[in-house]
């Protein structure tokens, strides 16, 4: 099972007209279901087997079996969960189909010899994950529904998709001034050690409630006592609102909350801060802040990060444009 999950994880890194006839009243055979059309992209079919045999779907099924047991997918709830997952994966397959079609249009598909060579290289990279143990590799392929041939075809498609993405993003550039601006605006991200703050908060529903809480705290009432009394954050209420030590770069907290907390000095209490969860009164119990690294020492890392972000933006914009211009039809009734 672990080997199968490992292969699926490696593969998933790559990417990533209802007609009612008498035939619809007849139960389809497994073979017929596998060949049923679940989408058409500019006239090209995506069959159910393309989805069911995809690494993404295999990974979903593996996770469901591990978490809920073998019988879950047969239940009504299980079928609904799987159908929703299939819808998401189908959207990815549609995107891939558009990209493969654009590969032909943009003439970025390598000649067969080169494509085979690149695919073989990727196969060898996957084998290396299994320490080049051929038997273990073949057993894992079998358990994930792949053969050597279908794996290679899948990898060929991923190579073409990668080349299309590279073509779309090839003109993306980041200047030193862009990196300097980002550095100046985010210096807390470039300290010699991660800056941390010990934080407490009180969460209430409305701004009026938050103002009343702030008034009590301004009158020198004990923060922990007030938090235990009125805070609606069940995770920290009984601890007097204590959230503990938080890194300045912690992405588990609301960005507005983090921005307000970072701006406070040690010992300070904020005015009401509005986030998706309600209104917070934030207290900084203590801070540990470290010197900022010199710009030149982090410049290339910043440029690399910004370039990746710009490439993602360019790719997302282009694929949305291509999909909008494509003739796409889905057949959700054939997903299950």
Curated annotation (Swiss-Prot):
A lipid is attached at residue 23 (N-palmitoyl cysteine). PROSITE patterns: PPIC_PPIASE_1, PPIC_PPIASE_2, PROKAR_LIPOPROTEIN. Its main location: membrane. Pfam families: Rotamase_2 (PF13145), SurA_N_3 (PF13624). It is a lipid-anchor. Its EC number is 5.2.1.8. It is found in: Cell membrane. Keywords: Cell membrane, Isomerase, Lipoprotein, Membrane, Palmitate, Rotamase, Signal. Residues 1-22 form the signal peptide. Residues 194-286 form the PpiC domain. GO terms for molecular function: peptidyl-prolyl cis-trans isomerase activity. The keyword Coiled coil does not apply. Gene3D superfamilies: 3.10.50.40, Porin chaperone SurA, peptide-binding domain. It catalyses: [protein]-peptidylproline (omega=180) = [protein]-peptidylproline (omega=0). A lipid is attached at residue 23 (S-diacylglycerol cysteine). One of its GO terms (biological process) is protein folding. Belongs to the PrsA family. Plays a major role in protein secretion by helping the post-translocational extracellular folding of several secreted proteins. This is Foldase protein PrsA. It comes from Clostridium botulinum (strain Okra / Type B1). The lineage of its organism: Bacteria, Bacillati, Bacillota, Clostridia, Eubacteriales. The gene is prsA.
């Amino acid at each position: 099972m672990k080997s199968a999950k490992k292969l699926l994880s490696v593969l998933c890194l790559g990417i990533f007209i209802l007609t009612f006839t008498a035939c619809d009243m007849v139960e389809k055979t497994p073979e017929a279901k596998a060949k049923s059309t679940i989408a058409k992209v500019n006239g090209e079919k995506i069959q159910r087997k393309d989805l069911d045999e995809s690494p993404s779907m295999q990974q979903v099924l593996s996770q469901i079996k591990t978490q809920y047991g073998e019988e879950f997918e047969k239940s009504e709830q299980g079928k609904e969960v799987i159908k929703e997952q299939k819808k998401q994966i189908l959207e990815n397959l549609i995107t891939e189909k558009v990209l493969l079609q654009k590969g032909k249009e943009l003439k970025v598909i390598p000649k067969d010899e080169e494509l085979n060579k690149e695919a073989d290289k990727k196969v060898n990279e996957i084998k290396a994950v299994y320490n080049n143990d051929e038997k273990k590799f073949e057993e894992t392929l079998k358990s994930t529904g792949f053969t050597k041939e279908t794996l290679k075809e899948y990898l060929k498609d991923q190579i073409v998709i990668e080349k299309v993405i590279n073509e779309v993003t090839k003109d993306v550039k980041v200047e030193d001034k862009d990196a300097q601006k980002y550095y100046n605006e985010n210096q807390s991200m470039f300290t010699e050690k991660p800056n941390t703050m010990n934080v407490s908060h009180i969460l209430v529903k409305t701004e009026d409630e938050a103002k009343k809480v702030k008034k009590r705290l301004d009158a020198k009432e004990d923060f922990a006592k007030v938090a235990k009394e009125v805070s609606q954050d069940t995770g920290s209420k009984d601890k007097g609102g204590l959230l503990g030590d938080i890194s300045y770069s912690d992405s588990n907290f609301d960005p507005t909350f983090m921005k307000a907390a970072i701006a406070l000095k040690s010992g300070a209490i904020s005015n009401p801060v509005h986030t998706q969860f309600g209104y917070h009164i934030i207290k900084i119990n203590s801070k540990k802040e470290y010197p900022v690294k010199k710009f030149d020492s982090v410049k290339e890392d910043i440029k690399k990060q910004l370039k990746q972000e710009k490439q993602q933006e360019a790719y997302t914009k282009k694929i949305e444009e291509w999909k909008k211009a494509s003739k796409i039809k889905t057949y959700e009734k054939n997903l299950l």
